[in-house]
Amino acid sequence: MKAQSSVLPVVVGILVVIIAVAVGVYVYNQYVMLSSPSASSSTGTSTGPSKISIPYSSSNKTVFLTIVVESSSNVNQFNFNGTSSGSLVIYIPAGSTVIVKFINQESLPHNLVLLQNSTPTPQSPEISSDGKIIDIVGATTSNYDVNGISGGASAEGVWGPISAGDYMLVCGILGHAASGMWAVLVASNNVTAPYAVID
């Protein structure tokens, strides 16, 4: 009986390591897909930005989205996946559920808000003046304007199903969106598989 009980913790430990490595690889691959400007469609002459595929389960209309606040001397500290001021545009099929992983590599706290915008760009330090808050990752409805996840932390959320329309992804902390920390999300009946473009 002693031999069996000493094997069980080893097996459990190995399984935990395998799962941790698999999750790490999955998150890294999503990050690379959305942060690199590499194309899924490039054939010599280009008429616009390249499409970057986003992981998707068509059987249950679920989009798997990773948004990273990058910490680099090459990017604005108010960024999503190294982009700012709406240059990241994400297209998803209308009616999709989005499982979002939000990672903050920057030293300042940040959060991620899905905003059904009433303005084309963030106009006010307080984001609720720019539209209707649909959901929040990394804060709550009572503290999104001052709280977020700290550097090195991550948070996850589930949004949707998201109706057809134009939305913004913004950091809700006062002034962050107006400083460029926003991207565009378009939910459309004409989109069959999610993708992103970086202008």
Swiss-Prot record:
The chain crosses the membrane at residues 7-27. It holds the Pfam family SoxE_N. One of its GO terms (molecular function) is copper ion binding. Cu cation binds at H110, C171, H176, M181. InterPro entries: Cu_oxidase_CS, Cupredoxin, SoxE, SoxE-like_C, SoxE_N. It comes from Sulfolobus acidocaldarius (strain ATCC 33909 / DSM 639 / JCM 8929 / NBRC 15157 / NCIMB 11770). It comes from the Archaea. It is found in: Cell membrane. It is a single-pass type II membrane protein. Residues 79-188 form the Plastocyanin-like domain. Belongs to the multicopper oxidase family. GO terms for cellular component: plasma membrane. This is Sulfocyanin.
